[in-house]
Amino acid sequence: MRALVLALVLAAPLAAAEESVRLDAAPIDPRDVASLQAGARTFVNYCLNCHAAGMMRYHKLLEIGLNEQQIKDNLLFTADKVGELMNVAMTRREAKEWLGTVPPDLSVIARARGADWLYTYLRSFYRDSESATGWNNMVYERVAMPHVLWTLSGQQVQVDRKFKNMEQAEGIARQQKSAWKIDVLTPEQAGKDAERFILKTIRTETPGSLSQLEYDLLVRDLVNFMTWMSEPNQLERKQAGYVVLLVLLVLLVLAYLLYKEFWKDVH
C-alpha cells in the first residue's frame, strides 16, 4: 500500500502536462499466460537491472505457468531463492550517484499510471541531444530514464508540424500509429505566424532489431506482465465480484417475494 500511495503522489504533478498526449489502448489480457511469461522475461532482462519490484516474490511467477526450475534458470538473477523479493543489487545511494535519481519501484506502477500510459510511454522515446541521457519521451517530457529498449525499437526522432486550426492538426494526428500531442501557441507566442497548432509526433530514423509490429507486441507483453504484477489476484477478485452480485440478486428476489407474502392480505 505504501508503494502505491508513493507512486500516486509522484504521478500527480505530471498529470496536467500529460493530458494533451493521446494514449494508445493497451491490448493486454491477464489470462494470456504466454504473454505474461514473455513479459516476465523482458521485465527481468531489461527493467530489473535498475528498477526493483519489492512487493513481488519470484515464486508468484508459478501462477503464470512457470515452474521453479524455469524461474531459476531463466529469471532468477538478482536473488538466490525463488521465495525472495524481486529486488536489485544496486543500493539507493549507488543509484543516486550513478543515475542522478533513484529509479521507482515498479511493483504497482501499473495501478498508479495505468496500462494505457505504460504502453504508450514505452513506445514514445525519441532522440534528444539536449537531454543528459540523449533521450526524451513524448508522454513524459524530460524523463530521466534512458531508452533501454532502443536496440530493439530503433532510434526515433520528434517531428513537429504546424497547422492553422485544430481540425487540420487532429485530422493528421488520427492517422498516426505512434504517440502524438498538439501544442497550441497563444497569439503572443505565435506572433505573425498564423499556424498556432503544432502537432508533435515521432518517426523511426534508425531501425532496431525488431519491426514496429514486433516491438509493439514485446511492449504489450511487458505491460501485460506489469499490470498482472500490480495485482496478481485481479482475475479472482473479479470472479468473486460476479459471485457477490449474483448472490445479492438472488437475495433481492427473495426479499421481494417475502415482501409480497407479508403484505398480500393487507388492503
Show the residue positions of the predicted features.
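Bacterial N-terminal signal peptides
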Residues: R2-P13
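Electrostatic cytochrome c docking/interface patches
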Residues: A12, A16-R41, A52-E63, Q70-I71, ...
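Long, low-complexity intrinsically disordered regions enriched in Ser/Thr, Asp/Glu, Pro/Gly
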Residues: A16, I182-T186, R196, W263, ...
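Stable alpha-helical elements in mature extracytoplasmic
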Residues: D32-S35, T42-F43, V102, G114, ...
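The canonical Cys-X-X-Cys-His
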Residues: F43-G54, L222
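Electron-transfer interface patches adjacent to heme c in soluble/periplasmic c-type cytochromes
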Residues: L66-M138, V143-Q176, D183, K200-Y215
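Short, aromatic-rich amphipathic segments at membrane interfaces
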Residues: R203-V243
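Juxtamembrane interface at the cytosolic side of transmembrane helices
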Residues: R237-H267
